């Protein structure tokens, strides 16, 4: 069994990670660290786990007793922890924050988007889990970058559920504000854009265009629905072939002929992609569950690869559908 520890156990991504790991046939949770909840039962915070988890939060860190450590911490906290603690040499780390997503000679974290860096992830000791918007958008663009087709600015509009803002209440997360409402935030300056550009340039070294990304807050709890527009004269049939070929060996990305909707991916680790051609404009529709394919599900996917397991183990999940 893979023995796992979690640091930062009280948030939405941690809750989803716990749910996945307790049902994973090859994994045992050794500890869930949360200084603010130490001593409390996991079910005091993640109430949906009644009858499934009898663990309690702890402020202890028995790193020598685990094989893999997940960070579900606020941005900046993973880096502080890594710099202030003695990490066992063989301990594998999966960081769900943004601290190590951008490549640097100062760290050895691999960018953990399996559809881009599968081989590197399989042999990695440290993996940086991609951001939720970044995952959804990149999966819509990677095949085009592979074929050197991203030579102009890309227009992206994407709407995310309220869980994307995290568990801590804020002015835009209250039900009375969020329900039956929409709003734009961080237009053209979202923090996930640099990691998107990094990945596209990895496949297409000549890529120097802009990702004109406008994020929206939606009034639903979970999921990301993105539309991307790229100019190209290549026929739709050829583009579909490129996408199907690129993702042929990936278990969680599916190219769909019919139009897609969010409920087809919510509560799954899937990404669905639909392609349309309108004159010289290629419309790419990409959707994921922000907490699963965009966070905890992808983290478990990376763990499976790092420990040489079949990539879908523990991730065959039922979509909500209705």
From Swiss-Prot:
The residues annotated as the active site are 132
Q: Does the keyword Acyltransferase apply?
A: no
Which GO biological-process labels does this protein carry? L-arginine biosynthetic process
The pathway is: Amino-acid biosynthesis; L-arginine biosynthesis; N(2)-acetyl-L-ornithine from L-glutamate: step 3/4
Instruction: Indicate the family of this protein.
Output: Belongs to the NAGSA dehydrogenase family. Type 1 subfamily.
Coiled-coil annotated residue ranges, if any:
none
Q: Which domain of life is it from?
A: Bacteria
**SUPFAM superfamilies per the UniProt record, alphabetical:** Glyceraldehyde-3-phosphate dehydrogenase-like, C-terminal domain, NAD(P)-binding Rossmann-fold domains
- Functional description taken from the UniProt entry: Catalyzes the NADPH-dependent reduction of N-acetyl-5-glutamyl phosphate to yield N-acetyl-L-glutamate 5-semialdehyde.
Q: Which GO terms describe its molecular function?
A: N-acetyl-gamma-glutamyl-phosphate reductase activity; NAD binding; NADP+ binding
Q: What catalytic reaction does the record list?
A: N-acetyl-L-glutamate 5-semialdehyde + phosphate + NADP(+) = N-acetyl-L-glutamyl 5-phosphate + NADPH + H(+)
The entry's localization annotation reads: Cytoplasm
**Name of the molecule in the record:** N-acetyl-gamma-glutamyl-phosphate reductase
């Amino acid at each position: 069994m893979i023995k796992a520890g979690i640091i930062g156990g009280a948030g939405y991504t941690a809750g989803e990670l716990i749910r996945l790991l307790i049902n994973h046939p090859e994994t045992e949770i050794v500890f869930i660290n949360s200084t603010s909840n130490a001593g409390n039962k996991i079910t005091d915070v993640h109430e949906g786990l009644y009858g499934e988890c009898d663990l309690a939060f702890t402020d202890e860190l028995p790193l020598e007793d685990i094989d893999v450590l997940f960070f579900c911490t606020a941005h900046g906290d993973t880096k502080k922890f890594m710099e202030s603690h003695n990490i066992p040499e063989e301990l594998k780390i999966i960081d769900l924050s943004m601290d190590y997503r951008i490549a640097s000679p100062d760290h050895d974290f691999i960018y953990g988007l399996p559809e881009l860096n599968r081989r590197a992830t399989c042999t990695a000791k440290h993996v940086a889990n991609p951001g939720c918007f970044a995952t959804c958008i990149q999966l819509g663009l990677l095949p085009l970058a592979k074929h050197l087709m991203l030579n102009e600015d890309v227009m992206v509009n994407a709407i995310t559920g309220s869980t994307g803002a995290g568990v801590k209440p804020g002015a835009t997360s209250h039900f009375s504000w969020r329900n039956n409402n929409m709003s734009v935030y961080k237009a053209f300056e979202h923090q996930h854009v640099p990691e998107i550009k990094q990945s596209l340039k990895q496949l297409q070294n000549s890529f120097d265009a802009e990702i004109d990304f406008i994020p929206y807050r939606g009034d639903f709890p979970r999921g990301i629905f993105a539309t991307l527009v790229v100019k190209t004269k290549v026929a739709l049939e050829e583009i579909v072939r490129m996408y199907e070929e690129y993702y042929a060996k990936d278990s969680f990305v599916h190219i769909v002929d019919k139009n897609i909707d969010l409920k087809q991916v919510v509560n799954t680790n899937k990404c669905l992609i639909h392609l349309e051609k309108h004159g010289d404009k290629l419309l790419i529709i990409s959707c994921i569950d922000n907490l699963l394919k965009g966070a905890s599900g992808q983290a478990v996917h990376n763990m499976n690869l790092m420990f040489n397991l079949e990539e879908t183990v523990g991730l065959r999940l039922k979509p909500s559908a209705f």
